[in-house]
Amino acid sequence: MGARNSVLRGKKADELERIRLRPGGKKKYRLKHIVWAANKLDRFGLAESLLESKEGCQKILTVLDPMVPTGSENLKSLFNTVCVIWCIHAEEKVKDTEGAKQIVRRHLVAETGTAEKMPSTSRPTAPSSEKGGNYPVQHVGGNYTHIPLSPRTLNAWVKLVEEKKFGAEVVPGFQALSEGCTPYDINQMLNCVGDHQAAMQIIREIINEEAAEWDVQHPIPGPLPAGQLREPRGSDIAGTTSTVEEQIQWMFRPQNPVPVGNIYRRWIQIGLQKCVRMYNPTNILDIKQGPKEPFQSYVDRFYKSLRAEQTDPAVKNWMTQTLLVQNANPDCKLVLKGLGMNPTLEEMLTACQGVGGPGQKARLMAEALKEVIGPAPIPFAAAQQRKAFKCWNCGKEGHSARQCRAPRRQGCWKCGKPGHIMTNCPDRQAGFLGLGPWGKKPRNFPVAQVPQGLTPTAPPVDPAVDLLEKYMQQGKRQREQRERPYKEVTEDLLHLEQGETPYREPPTEDLLHLNSLFGKDQ
């Protein structure tokens, strides 16, 4: 622990805490990173005390540098941490880990005069030459030299096959990774694929067919003189009967070069395209947009299936212009047809943005509910016949008595007299049965309406009118008796005190005739 605590002190420790782990990042170095680096040095047989000086850090870098290209992430992190500590001991101003690594590289190059001590990340992949050369065949010292594929390239190819499972992305991925490769390198890539042996067998069959067709189209010219390079056969292009040196000579000879690497790549691309169709049996005609699927997701699926189709570009263009709109859902199709003839993809994506999503469904639902819940439109004739509200309190139209702002009207609203309400108003007309609880006039007999100012001279034609008037007067008297019972009781008591008999009206003839109307029921 003593060595760990004495590695950086004072200003050096403060300087360490100002250096960022990554360019533009928020995290910075702490003392715990030095403790971690000291623990990792024990695994490589290096003493912790080497971190206390600039020379000791340089010895650590000399040991770790050759292992960085193929080392683990912990080894690379240890190398980066030691570079930062070396810069602090050397009083070099750095802001982050990348700056410290660059300073260390320049120092190592200046001391040794070569780039042997530099990490592999800074080494060029191929030396410069007049003609140049694609990786892995490089032109060094006037000769073409073959460099095998790196494990990183092979690992990238295997991951591509395992993750995409021979999707449409495998073909362009193979083209990028096999650029400039010889048939020997391409066979290495194919041999690294462990799974999907059915697809590998399909590719082998395609290679055999293309090799046989090559032999038919390129027959052997005849016996060759000694020392002359022979012409490649189909098996030579496939890398089964040729060496790497012969393949390089065919590719880069000055007269009539044969790009065996590119030819072999085309054969494999044909096989990969068949594998893509086998592993992706969905036809582009079956790609249709779902009722709730966003238009952008539908376009992604459409173009992914179109990418797997091995057809003429003109046919693909027709599919894009016709099927993309034809297989859209009704909502998006209605929007796309409004864009006119041959709209661009950008216009279609912009116009259909949000169509079919939750926002658009919510708007449609809100509009539907608004139509259902909202009041039904009133016909013009019915609106003209509708009468306006009339207030019983102030007599004005346009509002009801409950909404009236005028002072509350006292007394009966019909006759204006106090002491009763409109329901019990004596001025209300009633039939021979009196005022019923229904609040309307009885319909037993028609009531003759006599105009004001006119008195009929002749007796009524119908005798029932005279009888109805008598019933109305009798009903009026009965209402008055019901409304003032206390007054009648007091009058009876006064008559008894005076020794008189209380006056009672005898039953009228009209009420006696009422019994005859109903027979024996009364």
Curated annotation (Swiss-Prot):
Interaction with Gp41, as annotated region: 7-31
Location of region: Dimerization/Multimerization of capsid protein p24: 279-365
Protein name: Gag polyprotein
Site location (Cleavage): 135-136, 365-366, 382-383, 431-432, 445-446
Gene3D superfamilies: 1.10.1200.30, Human Immunodeficiency Virus Type 1 Capsid Protein (1.10.375.10), Immunodeficiency lentiviruses, gag gene matrix protein p17 (1.10.150.90), Single helix bin (1.20.5.760), Zinc finger, CCHC-type (4.10.60.10)
Record's compositionally biased regions (Polar residues): 119-128
Region (Interaction with host PPIA/CYPA and NUP153): 191-228
Post-translational modification note: Gag-Pol polyprotein: Specific enzymatic cleavages by the viral protease yield mature proteins. Capsid protein p24 is phosphorylated possibly by host MAPK1; this phosphorylation is necessary for Pin1-mediated virion uncoating.
